Regions:
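Mid-length scaffold segments of soluble, non-membrane domains
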Residues: 114-116
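Acidic, Ser/Thr- and proline-rich intrinsically disordered linker/docking segments
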Residues: 3-23, 28-42, 47, 53, ...
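Short, hydrophobic/aromatic-rich segments at coil-to-beta transitions
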Residues: 118-120
Length: 199
């Protein structure tokens, strides 16, 4: 489906949920994904199925800066002065680079698939040990921001999440309804306006 088609599917699902309709269950046979009592999947988006999404988390990182170079330098006073000045410049660059890398920023990860349920968002994320499922409970979401095909979720106790891709507006519509209920239109105003004008 095209990006435009995915957008209109998001508008359609937003309108359906706003009118009180219930989404049907989507079968999911994924090892590691264990739904809670009463929880069921309503959408599955896999890179291999033609619905790729990108995934990033916003946080600071621990960066270790290690001094390199010889411990003992021998030479004329001019050579030693030049060496010390050059070393100071290189160390300054290395410290600035380490600070830049350690600063809070969006840090992307590989994302294999995303499952949207009635209670949580599940993401199969690439780690150093392969792929691992992480989930985000809707009741922990304090802010949902949809800008085009990018969704930013802010949580009570964990770092923010950024998803991007053609099907992200659909995910945003569903998450907004399960998290905010009747106030969902306030969380996804673009979808709500589009739903009002298309009906």
């Amino acid at each position: 489906m095209t990006t435009s088609g995915a957008w209109w599917e998001a508008v359609r699902v937003h309108a359906a949920l706003s009118s009180g309709q219930v989404l049907g269950t989507v079968p999911v046979t994924v090892p590691g994904l264990v739904p809670a009592q009463g929880e069921y999947a309503v959408g599955v988006f896999a890179r291999s199925g033609g619905a790729p999404m990108s995934y990033a988390r916003y946080y600071a990182a621990d960066v270790t800066w290690v001094h390199t170079g010889p411990r003992l330098v021998v030479g004329s006073p001019q050579f030693l002065t030049g060496y010390i000045l050059g070393l100071m410049v290189m160390q300054g660059r290395a410290r600035r680079r380490a600070r830049r890398l350690a600063a809070p920023q969006w840090r992307p990860y590989g994302l294999s698939q995303t499952v949207v349920t009635t209670r949580r968002l599940w993401c199969e994320v690439a780690t150093s040990d392969g792929y691992e499922w992480v989930n985000f409970n809707y009741d922990q979401i304090v802010n949902l921001g949809l800008t085009g095909d990018a969704l930013t979720l802010t949580f009570l106790q964990t770092s923010p999440l950024l998803l991007a891709g053609a099907w992200v507006p659909w995910c945003a519509a569903v998450i907004a309804h399960f998290r905010f209920g009747q106030n969902a239109p306030l969380a996804v105003p673009e979808l709500h306006r589009a739903a009002l004008t298309s009906s």
